[in-house]
């Protein structure tokens, strides 16, 4: 047997370690994370507390109340400014966000959210360190990966894991501070050691709290504390025909030779082969779909998990097979695990 400190890989000809879908999702995540960090210094979007208003695409975004206070406009024009500059943009943004969530679920979380990107990265590092994606995982996950590689835990990976937690905590705290105060002032003060007392306090406390969250509570935050994720899930649960991961129960016997790769791959620690109500916090990251695709490809079969929507999504909600229309092949159905 190979020593446990060394990763052991079993090559599978023609099978990549990541599917094309996951490569595409990774590029979306990287792009949005870069945008998240660079938006303040590029004046794309931030709240400047020194000016007392938002900055959007380099322009001051105010509600026009200063002109009313100076007597330059009347009450009606001031009310119109509130509606046009404040309520309408916010309503359009919220409506669009809720519609996407109602139709596709927590797509923002799985494909864009800069916090979830860190969650997945720390999960991967921690799994390489001790075989568990979280300190709260009861037992180590199987060393065999969906693509056939066998990777054993290596304690040396605790070093990049801890460094990653601290680095991303600091980067997040620094970035959040640039959303509130002039970015170049913050970056200059950080590099030269000239942070003010309040700036240093924000950065220190923010880094500490985020390090604790990234290290010990990142999944708990996504599942129970994130308001953005919660509202997406609520909108998604209100639509029985929304896009959801469906399991082909007609071929469930094919799972016998698998080590629950779909469950092991889920960053949110969910079980994809179950009812929708038990997948309330699913981020539509499709890691489970990719894992099943790779496992089945190794034996020349198609995946048992795939995205379904419309009438094909109803079995995932009810647990009952969908009624088959004449001349149509049966749709993949989902039923609760025994």
Per-region residue spans from a language model:
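Short metal-coordination and nucleic-acid-contact micro-motifs, chiefly zinc-binding Cys/His arrays
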Residues: 105-109, 218-222, 251, 258, ...
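Hydrophobic core positions of alpha-helical segments in small-molecule transporters
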Residues: 228, 282-285
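Inter-heme linker and motif-flanking segments adjacent to c-type heme-binding CXXCH motifs
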Residues: 232-247, 251-257, 264-281, 290-306
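Membrane-embedded alpha-helical bundles of multi-pass integral membrane proteins
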Residues: 1-244, 289, 306-338
